[in-house]
């Protein structure tokens, strides 16, 4: 943190790992973390433009890594979300735990929408429902499902662009596969 006194006042009881002279520019950059010997532990780039979570673009929620225990690729925007609270939750989590039951009820906050004009599939996710992975799929026969042909576009609701399913055929079906992480 840059100002340990201000941080301690805003987040009492949260341990501070160290101080940082600069500041993130909220415009996207390379983040590199090194150990005391100068050896790189982690390096990744982030951005404040889509497909990165746009609600975490300064002045409100912070970026939160989804399911950090699963060692996700930090450089992929779909592995991040906006925090549920302004400023984030340093030293704590805002993840809503999954305790069994219907995965769709746990993970989705609204309807799944297919827009054939823009060729997008979108879904509003429950804030903090990090215990699941959402995977868009398409089929022409409701038996064989394909996961290829989608581009993650980001946003809230989350959107996927559809670029390779055979639009124009007599039948085309879409769904979201929801599975535990």
Segment roles from a protein language model:
Residues 1-109:
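Intrinsically disordered, low-complexity linkers and terminal tails enriched in Ser/Thr/Pro/Gly
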């Amino acid at each position: 943190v840059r100002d340990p006194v201000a941080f301690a006042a805003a987040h009492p009881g949260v341990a501070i790992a160290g101080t940082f002279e600069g500041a993130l520019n909220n415009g996207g950059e390379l983040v590199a973390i090194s150990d005391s010997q100068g050896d790189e532990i982690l390096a990744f780039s982030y951005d404040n433009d889509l497909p990165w979570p746009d609600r975490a673009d300064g002045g409100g929620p912070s970026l939160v890594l989804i399911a950090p225990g699963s060692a996700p690729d930090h450089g992929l925007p779909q592995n991040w979300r906006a925090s549920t609270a302004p400023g984030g939750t340093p030293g704590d989590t805002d993840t809503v735990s999954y305790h069994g039951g219907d995965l769709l009820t746990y993970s989705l906050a609204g309807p799944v929408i297919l827009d054939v004009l823009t060729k997008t599939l979108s879904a509003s996710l429950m804030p903090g429902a990090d215990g699941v992975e959402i995977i868009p799929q398409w089929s022409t026969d409701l038996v064989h499902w394909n996961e290829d042909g989608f581009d993650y576009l980001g946003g809230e609701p989350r959107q996927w662009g559809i670029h390779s399913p055979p639009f124009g055929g007599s039948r085309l079906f879409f769904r979201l596969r929801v599975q535990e992480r």
